[in-house]
Regions:
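Active-site/substrate-binding loop(s) of hydrolase catalytic cores
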Residues: 1-151, 156-184
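His/Asp/Glu-rich mid-to-C-terminal helical/loop segments that flank catalytic regions of hydrolases
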Residues: 176-212
Length: 212
């Protein structure tokens, strides 16, 4: 969503971390993992100052079930690339206007969700909380009941079609309740730092038994 600019700061931090030639941790991760990165899913919406839609007026995170090239070309081409390359891990980065927390929403509503799926989600969330005190696991969206996943959303579509850990990361617009910084609130440097932690947690996830 183009109005959720904290996601752009997160992405800038992620790219800086991954591409830093002096970072031994990122070099080790890149030896094992190939990252396919979409820096901005909605450049037209960003350029036009939209909150949630692209130039055609479509909310792209409700177009993943059957995107059309004339309405949601951004989703269409990314879905095609995913089908061609495959997906083993997926993180969709957003901001939430109402909840003053950093949290992750999983896709528990998928019909095939099982104990293994839950263990993967729990491992990643808990590891991220260990790495970064700005992230927490106590507050977030309530999980959907089995069979009620929204497959028009990126996480639901990817989790359903690729059977991988698929998540949505949400960050606050103003500040975090548990770790507030009143002088700056939730800002670019904190978004970047969270990106670094997310990537470290990716490596730990693939090192763990739960990712198998």
């Amino acid at each position: 969503h183009p109005g959720e600019t904290m996601a752009q700061w997160w992405m800038e931090g992620a790219l800086e971390w991954l591409l830093d030639p002096t970072n031994a941790q990122s070099r080790a991760l890149l030896e094992r993992c190939t990252f396919f990165v979409v820096p901005n899913m909605n450049p037209d919406g960003s350029r036009r100052g939209h909150l949630r839609t692209n130039a055609a007026g479509r909310n792209l995170n409700r177009e993943w079930a059957a995107p059309a090239m004339d309405a949601a070309p951004e989703v269409f081409v990314v879905r095609e690339a995913m089908a061609r390359e495959g997906v083993d891990f997926f993180l969709d980065v957003h901001g939430d206007e109402s909840l003053p927390y950093c949290f992750i929403a999983g896709v528990e509503g998928l019909s095939g969700w099982d104990e293994s799926s839950q263990a993967q989600l729990d491992f990643y969330k808990n590891r991220l909380a260990d790495l970064n005190p700005d992230f927490q696991t106590a507050v977030g969206y309530p999980p959907k009941a089995p069979g009620e996943a929204n497959l028009t959303m990126a996480g639901g579509h990817v989790g359903h079609h690729f059977g991988c850990l698929a998540m949505t990361l949400e960050m606050p617009f103003k500040d975090t309740t548990a770790t507030p910084e009143p002088a700056v609130g939730w800002n670019g440097p904190r978004s970047k730092a969270l990106a670094h932690s997310c990537l470290l947690a990716v490596g730990d996830y693939f090192d763990s038994n739960v990712s198998q």
